[in-house]
Amino acid sequence: MLSIPSPQVLLALFSMTDLDDSTCKKYIKMITNIVILSLIICISLAFWIMSMTASTYYGSLRPVSPWRWLFSVVVSVVISCNGFKKKSLDHSGALGGLVVGFILTIANFSFFTSLLMFFLTSSKLTKWRGEMKKRLDSEYKEGGQRNWVQVFCNGGVPTELALLYMIENGPGEMPIDFAKQHTASWMCLSLLAALASSAGDTWASEVAPVLSKSSPRLITTWEKVPVGTNGGVTAVGLVSSLLGGTFVGLAYFLTQLVFVNDLDISAPQWPLIAFGGLAGLLGSIVDSFLGATMQFSGLDESTGLVVSSPTQETKHISGKPILDNNAVNLFSSVLVALLLPTAASGFWPTV
């Protein structure tokens, strides 16, 4: 005759077999990470197989190492997910960052470290003294929360240059040497200039409103303007832009020392640091000039904050409503990326 277990026995069995919510979440997270890692490995192997097939078919193409594929995919996923988790990127920004990060990493590790330096420092500075910035900026977002448009305007030019670099030179690191590889060296400096320009502008925008003791001056007329005015510059902002670009150039230079083998028979690489600083400063100046002339700035008399959209309640300060902030960033990045490497090629030291 079968006996029915008592309620106490059933409860004990249930408590032994049933996991609490926190344990379940840990197991689910662990399984999810395993699945994601497995997918990443499969994707990396698939890319490697395609590169090997293309190399065999065309003959002139150099196959990419499977470890390079794996590193490029893993790092891009980790950084994008981390940026989204910390609110530096929104959903679309994380997807855009994934594409930009992957292309720059697979092309050249020096590109990757420069991008990483720009992203990490800019994200930290955006969050720095956020409460104070919220009182000064009408469009302030916690953590930055950059979308795909902002990612494209800051990373679109470097991404296109990285693709052209791979077509010209193939994936891999190389010394900057205009005498031996003029076109590829120009592309590398152009990409560095674009990233350093964006970093310089971001550093100036995030540091100057907090640390500057004096009112900004409009770059076109040198008149004093309220904090947050497009085209307003300060000494603190200009120094910050120089430092921002220098940090990006330093990241590129250090990566060259680690991954490039024939530096002893190539042109000196130390000018990369000065080049990055100059690109950051020039990018900030060009951005300020475009902002002062082609971007509307007005004072909202109801809030006392500077706004970028003309309304009946705003008092015009400077500029015309032709471009928005994203377009200004894109145009300044393009101009610096085109002009500065051409000028640098004439002064770059030789062996």
UniProtKB/Swiss-Prot annotation:
- Indicate yes or no for the key word Ion transport: no
Give the stretches traversing the membrane.
Answer: 30-50, 64-84, 99-119, 233-253, 272-292, 328-348
Q: Which UniProt keywords apply?
A: Membrane, Transmembrane, Transmembrane helix
Membrane-related topology note: Multi-pass membrane protein
Q: Name one GO cellular component term.
A: membrane
Q: Superkingdom of the source?
A: Eukaryota
- Which compartments does it reside in? Membrane
Pfam families from the entry? DUF92 (PF01940)
Family statement drawn from the similarity comment of this UniProt entry: Belongs to the TMEM19 family.
UniProt-recorded name of the protein = Transmembrane protein 19
